Amino acid sequence: MAISFLNEDEGLSFTRSLLVGAARPGAAIAAHVAADSDSGIVRIDVAEAVESTCFQAVRQAGTKAYIGYGERVFIVDCVTEDVVMHQMDGYFCEFFDAEELETSGADFCVLASSASELFAFGPDGALLWKTTQLGIDGVLVHSATGTHIKGSGEWDPPGGWEPFILATRTGERVSGGSAPRR
């Protein structure tokens, strides 16, 4: 399956259309996503919210579409149309998937980072764990093994990155991940 953000003029035809993140009927649409599934192309409209939108990204794993936008991550099942939303502490940063990190995927399928946190999701889209206070202006993942996730969080922008190591299965902090002492 393929997934991408859409431009208004792409002219695709969709088998289904979903609206995610709307707190009220008639909410304005901030972004459009197309997810190609076995049953056709699903259009997912992301409702506008009052939040910072620094970065946006999409990933697809099995029947799940992961959408990072604003301060939220949406997990949409393209078959059942079930939607789960996770509110982030600060803006969404980036997705990292097990394949990209060259891990087996046994402990997580997708990682999502925010300005200060890291979320781990399983192959069914369920939240496995969340680790907070890894930075204040961005969290990056550099590598992952069956036992550890190595990354860095920005504590003193611009450029004040501090390393951290988390346990892959639990997200428990092994080392780092806190503001440097002055």
Segments predicted by a language model, with ranges:
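Short beta-strand elements that form the blades of beta-propeller/WD-repeat-like
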Residues: 11-31, 56-69, 73-74, 102-114, ...
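Repeated scaffold domains used in trafficking and secretory/extracellular systems
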Residues: 2-22, 45-62, 88-107, 134-146, ...
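Structural recognition of the beta-propeller blade-terminating site
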Residues: 77-80, 121-124, 165-167
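Acidic, small-residue rich beta-repeat scaffolds with periodic aromatic anchors
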Residues: 143-182
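Aromatic (tryptophan-biased) beta-strands that constitute blades/sheets of beta-rich domains
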Residues: 39-48, 83-91, 122, 126-135, ...
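An internal, amphipathic alpha-helical element
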Residues: 112, 129, 139-143
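A short helix->beta-strand "capping" segment at the edge of beta-propeller domains
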Residues: 2, 29-51, 78-80
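Charged linear interaction tracts used for macromolecular binding and regulation
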Residues: 70, 75-104, 114
